[in-house]
Amino acid sequence: MKILALDSSGLVASVAVVEVDTLLGEYTINYMKTHSQTLLPMLDEVAKMIELDLNTVDVIAVSAGPGSFTGLRIGSATAKGLALALHKKIVSVPTVDALAYNLWNSPSLVCPLMDARRQQTYTGLYKFTDGTMDTVLPQCVVGIQEIIEKINEMGEAVTFLGDGVPVFREYIEENLKVPFSFAPAHCNKQRGASVAVLGAILYAQGKAEDAADHKPEYLRMSQAERERKEKERDFRI
């Protein structure tokens, strides 16, 4: 099976193609350009380099959230457009799960941290047992203090990764009471390859969907939505 994977959920944009257990190509960039400028050119470049006929792709996997609202919309719109044009299914891969999968078979707890602003983080907790990733805490949006308290209660060593690490590193170092480490550069941000491999697992579980049914998983309202609700509430008062 051949999977095309897209991830534009955070600062990183990544495109990958995986066939069975082989990574045919991956293009990842973390630079000062919007994903609307980079994602399709990256896909085009990968397709050229590996001589990919998009019609041979079996399914499209996309990092479906949480994350940057704009980034998620770009990734989902790109995946939907491709799926509709190619008559393929989409597999929605939870962003935090895919991040955790970067550290496959880690002996410690894995805790992805994505900066959700306002001292909050998109996060979760994961363990690997005999090559299988088990979810200890499903992806969620919480205050950084809440996830650190949870880890302290569990009393297990943990490895952190994600764009939230630089934001919360000082807090972690001051408040965490268990052994901890930070993932190195080659595996500490979103990767299309992880989205593809986890997407293959979800596809085998029958979790593919029609393009028309796909939508991002934001986990919370946008700033504009919150402000609108506040105005509506004030108006009712």
Residue locations for each model-derived region?
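Acyltransferase
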Residues: 181-237
